[in-house]
Design a protein with these regions (language model features):
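Short beta-edge strand/loop motif at the mouth of beta-sheet-based domains
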Residues: 5, 25-61
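A generic structural signal for beta-strand entry/edge sites
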Residues: 1, 49, 70-72, 110-114
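Solvent-exposed alpha-helix faces
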Residues: 22-25, 138
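Short beta-strand segments that buttress and anchor functional surface loops
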Residues: 49-55, 75-77, 117-119
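Short amphipathic
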Residues: 3-10
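A conserved amphipathic terminal alpha-helix motif
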Residues: 95-98, 120-148
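Hydrophobic-ligand binding "helix-grip"
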Residues: 38-41, 57-110
Length: 148
């Protein structure tokens, strides 16, 4: 697995950035950087499951490892599925995807807030993450700063 790092400085409170990351409707606004109808179902609770999907494209299921409100979210992917909601646990693509990990860290220092995103993934997904996060981080920043 490779480690990818992305970050953006945001002029907003940790509460606002946390809300942008975890609220269903706000998530849809920035996650469109990855797919047009990207959304999630589930609760941000340690040990719980969450599903990220686009109804037209399928998605992924993840288990939440860490929830430190206003500070850190961490989860790892355990399955991918087709638009018809059938899991692909044995497919070649699934074997490369399962185990991928995402970590979202909100760091504050004086008046600075930095959102750090760390991804551990297979080489096949580097381009997807690079392109997606290049679009998603400015959206997260803009949405967070709307009501800062």
């Amino acid at each position: 697995m490779l480690t990818l790092n992305y970050y953006v400085e945001i002029s907003a409170t940790p509460q606002r950035v946390w809300e942008v990351l975890t609220d269903v409707e706000l998530y849809k606004r920035w996650a469109q950087a990855f797919s047009p109808q990207s959304q999630f179902e589930g609760a941000w609770e340690e040990g719980g499951g969450i599903t990220f999907f686009d109804p037209d494209m399928g998605g992924t299921r993840a288990i939440i490892d860490t929830v430190l409100p206003l500070q850190k979210l961490e989860f790892h992917h355990v399955a991918i599925f087709n638009p018809d909601n059938r899991q692909q646990l044995d497919a070649d693509l699934a074997s490369r995807w399962i185990g991928s990990r995402e970590i979202y860290q909100i760091d504050t220092n004086n008046d600075r807030l930095l959102l750090n995103v760390t991804i551990h993934t297979h080489n096949d997904f580097v381009s997807m993450f690079n392109h997606g996060w290049a679009k998603a981080l400015p959206l997260i920043k803009a949405i967070s700063e709307e009501q800062a």
